[in-house]
Amino acid sequence: MKINGNEIRPGNVIEHEGGLWAAVKVQHVKPGKGGAFAQVELKNLVDGRKLNERFRSAETVERVRLEQKDYQYLYENDGMLTFMDNETYEQIELSREWVGDRAAFLQDGMKVTVESHEGKALGISLPDQVVLEITETEPTVKGQTATSSYKPALLENGVRVMVPPFITTGERIVVDTNEVTYLRRAD
């Protein structure tokens, strides 16, 4: 779908210079002399490169709609993560490296959303929060309540997060997968 250069919004995916780019930041500029334009920070969806580009309001760009499909995480084998389509039971494999650091939060049976374009996976969305058990943390020091100090804790998936002093080893906590931070105790 063609859109004008001044209609680009953050989050839009456009086809530009032969690749797929996501608009990260958009700033509309109206200089005193000349026509208005949109200063757009783009991120390549395939290799992660960034690019700053100006689009005049008269220019048109191709806006791309990504296909979103729900998958269920099954297992990891030799650095490849296997997901299953819940409707067709078809399985796809994505490399752990491609998924990135957030792969540590994948749990058996977890539902994820894979974004793709023309059959090629471009992005993966995990749930915003996961419940994990603390396997190791320092004991609380009595009298250390004057300041709100956090202490490091090792989670069952090997990730370290900072937790409040009242959290102990063996407790289950809710972790934000985007920020990799402690949110609260699990119910």
From Swiss-Prot:
Biological processes annotated in GO: peptide biosynthetic process
Matching InterPro entries: Elong-fact-P_C, NA-bd_OB-fold, Rib_uL2_dom2, Transl_elong_fac_P/YeiP, Transl_elong_KOW-like, Transl_elong_P/YeiP_cen, Transl_elong_P/YeiP_CS, Transl_elongation_fac_P
Annotated compartments: Cytoplasm
Keywords associated with the record: Cytoplasm, Elongation factor, Protein biosynthesis
GO cellular component: cytoplasm
Keyword Protein biosynthesis on entry: yes
Primary residence: cytoplasm
UniProt xrefs under SMART domains: EFP, Elong-fact-P_C
GO MF assignments: translation elongation factor activity
UniProt pathway: Protein biosynthesis; polypeptide chain elongation
Record function comment: Involved in peptide bond synthesis. Stimulates efficient translation and peptide-bond synthesis on native or reconstituted 70S ribosomes in vitro. Probably functions indirectly by altering the affinity of the ribosome for aminoacyl-tRNA, thus increasing their reactivity as acceptors for peptidyl transferase.
NCBIfam families on file: efp, PRK00529.1
Family membership noted in the UniProt record: Belongs to the elongation factor P family.
Name of the protein in its database record: Elongation factor P
Species annotation: Parvibaculum lavamentivorans (strain DS-1 / DSM 13023 / NCIMB 13966)
Name of the gene encoding the protein in the UniProt record: efp
